[in-house]
């Protein structure tokens, strides 16, 4: 990785009443908690963007169930936009943390400046490309003749706000990685609350239906984007957006490190596409019903995976900063507490998912059709059987990414996705469309075992090499 010129120590003037997390000196248990909880809550609130849309859409008179399936078909395109934001945000944020740990403010500033330009460029390209290809993509992603009009209507309006979505998601990582996880949470909450207020107004009061849901989402993302820009231009963060230090090597480093989270989300996209295609092709007369049920199941999984990614991603700055400083002891202790937090959260969500009452209440938010509700609750029970092992996968793989150890994190991520795709294709062919829902728990168990083995055998050696590079000795 390119060596940037060392700068002055990164300091914060206490002009603002905002809690500052000192990544290199605060006690690890409290530090992990202060970073993980706001990031987890922020991601949980972020889930409301899609869940609130789908909840209101599912309750539109007469057409709610089909319209809900249409919005679900749009999921891969929405996720693709998020993937590009994550490519830059999750690629640049760990590098900024590492440079801050090295007390290299000039290098950190150059990283943020280049990432800002990359985010804007990607947003423009995505908007143009998605508009040109949206109809073909929606059909390819599984839209039937009845579902397509609702999917196309939602997508046509949603794409107008691509730049807001990319900037709000990508820039938020640079707020969190500087120790201001509370402000990162506020950025997400602003958009979510606005979305909650605007959805019923546009959908029901103004009778805009699916169009109203898309308009509400665009306006909400614009509000989150504006807040993130304010914080990174004029807020209390030590490293702000500047318009200097542009460098192709910096962009290369960001894109290389961010490739892991980008491909992870992109492969999640492939999983959703495979799910929809298999349900459409092997669901027979029930294909529309199965697609609607799957949309609700995936919405439920978002309330697990998004907060879980908040825990593992929000604490990457602790690992990145101390990796930059060469403090192996703090890295080990931090990873231990991150894993404990992730396991606790997933255990709670497992109980919630397996309890008929709680799962039934969730499904009831989307549909009042008894047949849809019964089938969806059953699929939620199946899909979440291995939620607890999923915590191991997220905590360890994201931890490796936070320390810039892409050589280990990328293969582990691909391994889980590959198993899932193979099972999602094989199970419906062999046992029928509903069997596809077993692909998730089976792949989660296998991936968690393999990831744990790789982590405990490979990571200690990589950390020793890092300490040797910095001229330090391992503290036993």
Model-predicted segments: where are they?
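Residue-level hotspots within pore-lining transmembrane alpha-helices
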Residues: 41, 45, 49, 81-85, ...
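Transmembrane helical elements of multi-pass membrane transporters/channels
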Residues: 34-53, 157, 191, 220-224, ...
């Amino acid at each position: 990785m390119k060596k940037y010129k060392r700068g002055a120590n990164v300091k914060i003037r206490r002009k603002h009443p905002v809690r500052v997390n000192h990544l290199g000196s605060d006690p690890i248990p409290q530090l992990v908690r202060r970073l993980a909880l706001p990031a987890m809550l922020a991601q949980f609130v972020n889930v409301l963007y899609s869940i609130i849309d789908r909840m209101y859409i599912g309750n539109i008179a007469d057409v709610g169930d089909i319209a809900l399936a249409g919005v679900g078909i749009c999921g891969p395109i929405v996720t693709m936009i998020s993937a590009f934001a994550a490519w830059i945000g999750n690629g640049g944020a760990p590098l900024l943390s590492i440079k801050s740990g090295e007390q290299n403010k000039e290098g950190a500033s150059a990283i943020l400046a280049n990432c800002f330009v990359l985010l804007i460029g990607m947003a423009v390209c995505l908007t143009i490309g998605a508009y040109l290809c949206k109809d073909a993509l929606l059909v390819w992603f599984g839209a039937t003749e009845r579902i397509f009009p609702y999917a196309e209507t939602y997508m046509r309006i949603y794409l107008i706000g691509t730049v807001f979505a990319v900037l709000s998601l990508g820039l938020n990582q640079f707020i969190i990685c500087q120790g201001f996880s509370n402000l990162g949470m506020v950025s997400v909450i602003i958009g979510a609350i606005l979305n909650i207020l605007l959805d019923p107004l546009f959908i029901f009061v103004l009778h805009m239906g699916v169009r109203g849901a898309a308009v509400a989402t665009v306006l909400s993302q614009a509000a989150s984007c504006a807040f993130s820009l304010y914080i990174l231009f004029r807020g209390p963060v030590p490293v702000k957006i500047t318009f200097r230090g542009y460098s192709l090597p910096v962009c290369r480093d960001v894109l290389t490190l961010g490739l892991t989270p980008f491909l992870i989300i992109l492969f999640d996209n492939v999983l959703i596409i495979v799910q929809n295609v298999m349900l459409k092709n092997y669901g027979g007369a029930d294909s529309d019903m199965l697609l609607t049920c799957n949309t609700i199941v995936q919405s439920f999984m978002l309330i697990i995976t998004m907060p879980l990614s908040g825990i593992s991603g929000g604490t990457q700055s602790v690992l990145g900063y101390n990796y930059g400083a060469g403090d192996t002891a703090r890295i080990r202790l931090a990873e231990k507490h991150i894993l404990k937090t992730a396991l606790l959260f997933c255990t709670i969500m497992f109980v919630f998912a397996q309890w008929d009452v709680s799962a039934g209440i969730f499904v009831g938010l989307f549909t009042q059709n008894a047949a849809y509700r019964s089938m969806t609750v059953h699929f939620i029970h199946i899909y979440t059987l291995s939620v607890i092992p999923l915590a191991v996968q997220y905590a360890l793989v994201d931890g490796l990414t936070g320390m810039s150890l892409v050589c280990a994190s990328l293969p582990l991520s691909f391994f889980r996705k590959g198993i899932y795709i193979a099972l999602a294709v094989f199970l419906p062919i062999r046992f029928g469309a509903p069997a596809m829902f077993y692909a998730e728990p089976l792949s989660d168990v296998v991936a968690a075992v393999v990831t744990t083995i790789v982590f405990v055998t490979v990571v200690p050696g990589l950390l020793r090499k890092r300490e040797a590079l910095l001229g330090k000795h391992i503290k036993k």
